[in-house]
């Protein structure tokens, strides 16, 4: 192996070890952040759980940004220049007075420490805004270089706010808690939290009612088109047993959108066929209701007929009717036509018997006799 190949192999090994160590560090930090999040939720529950950003009442706001910032050293909690838009996003009245919104932003940087281990810094902030100026803010920071994790949750109603911040040292396990009151006394904190919870819950109900109202004004779907197919046996002089008449009964739609069943109409044939279409006293018609809305009513009726156990005598459509003798189409007109056929008998062109002559003299004499007769 060449020297270049050996160096590249060592570099790949070092890169793999670094990636494994970084993944292990990230997983450990994520587990620690989840544990702190559970700790904060146990102390101050989230009243916006009913109105999560994935519900119908929430709308993603256009101010949501995910800035791509270069790697910079940390400068304290939420005061570093690497997060210049956090305060603007948190302080803006995103949801207004009639809606709900959710905004979140996250920044993460990675650098190599003196010992070659990766140092990861991650900070995130989120804001949930409800109707009536109700707002909840969450800020988290975790730094593997200092081993410090911080989380702050604030409840805001207009200009009043109650913020609880917790800081934990992962190396020593020490946990500190601080509270901040804005335009609020410490003795009013409990009453303020109850007011915040009630307003947030009421805003969630209003958002859901608004979403339901939008669905209520949608036009109702029209009723499914239904048709009734009737198969009746027919008496016929033939010996065939599979003659029948299939009648399709279509509903009549009124202006109010209701369906009224129309009476079946008789076949548009001659009088004999209309009489033959009546059912016999010994057999009752079978009716199948098809509501699939397509034009293949005959196939659907046959499937229903088979499912009912009548497969031994399948109903087939009637064959083309033979023309009865009484029909004008079956008789030949005897009246003379104004356009006689060219091969018909014509008195002006009568066939004459052909005479046969045995000699030329007989033929010549006959020709002369005919010629003399024409001259006369």
Curated annotation (Swiss-Prot):
Keywords associated with the record = Cytoplasm, Phosphoprotein
Q: Provide an example Pfam family for this protein.
A: Mlf1IP
Record field: compositional bias (Polar residues) = 262-273
The UniProt annotation puts the region (Interaction with DREF) at 96-202
Q: Which GO terms describe its molecular function?
A: DNA-binding transcription factor binding; protein-folding chaperone binding
Per the record, the GO terms for biological process are:
positive regulation of crystal cell differentiation; protein stabilization; regulation of cell proliferation involved in compound eye morphogenesis; regulation of DNA-templated transcription
Q: Which GO terms describe its cellular component?
A: cytoplasm; nucleus; perinuclear region of cytoplasm; polytene chromosome interband
The compartments listed are: Cytoplasm
- Region span, Disordered: 124-147, 187-224, 250-376
Q: Which residues carry this modification: Phosphothreonine?
A: 323
Give the UniProt family note: Belongs to the MLF family.
Q: Please give the PANTHER family that the UniProt record associates with this protein.
A: MYELOID LEUKEMIA FACTOR
Name of the molecule in the record: Myeloid leukemia factor
Gene source species: Drosophila melanogaster (Fruit fly)
Lineage from the top down? Eukaryota, Metazoa, Ecdysozoa, Arthropoda, Hexapoda
